[in-house]
Amino acid sequence: MPLRIAFDLDGVLADMESELVHQAEILFGAPMTHRLQARAADRDQTTTVVAEDSGDAATEAVVDGQPAAETTLDNTPPLLKLKMTSRQQRKLWKHVEAIENFWETLAELEPGVIERLATMAAERRWEVIFLTKRPQTAGSTAQVQTQRWLKAKGFPLPSVFVVQGSRGRIAAALDLHIVIDDRPENCLDVVVDSKARAILVWREEEKHVPAATRRLGIGVVKTTADCLDVLSEIDSTTSQRSGLFDRVRRLLGLKEDSLPA
């Protein structure tokens, strides 16, 4: 049976963050953006322990058989949450939503990786979908903009779902095997609320990965290209003797008891 794989877009394939910073500089001025960046760097030094404690709490909730605490979902990337006030965020998003076909202006985070994904999916008969919670902007719908962007980057006929709910429930409803995301809370949703396995694309320092991540069976890779290497190995003919999730566990260095039943 072919792999059924879902890819998040922003932070995994598309560089939304850089474009939002650019738009923030247009809106507020570069000096203010630089001050906010300095403030964010100071906060980073004091929030690492808090993040780890939150990860431990999430682990305990799952171990006790309780669902993980719900997180507030919005459309603001984590980096800008640290840098901007709520009022500034709202003003930025109002500005972005007025830009015609904004989602087609983004750069590819890793040039060529989308075309590589398309080639691998075609050769290996993977069923690939793309998940996003992008808000609407002027111009075409967020779905159509995203489809055109993916096609321009080398992925023909992309299946794009603009969704707001739990990634885990979506994975369960679509009977997905693997979900790739750059948000730890989305990966947690996947492993708690579905039978799918989650791979976290974590571009920051490894020491800042939430403590609960690996204990809950979430694989961690540094880049999307690394993720494609792992998927290739999972799907390789030399690994067919073992089960899919055993292959995921082995290739991502997870302990056997770390994968939820």
Give, region by region, the residue ranges found by the protein language model.
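Active-site neighborhood of HAD-like aspartate-dependent phosphohydrolases
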Residues: 1-91
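Substrate-recognition "cap/lid" segment bordering the active-site pocket of phosphatases
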Residues: 135-178, 184-189
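Acidic, Mg2+-coordinating phosphoryl-transfer loop and its flanking beta/alpha structural elements
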Residues: 179-219
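C-terminal accessory extensions appended to soluble enzyme cores
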Residues: 236-261
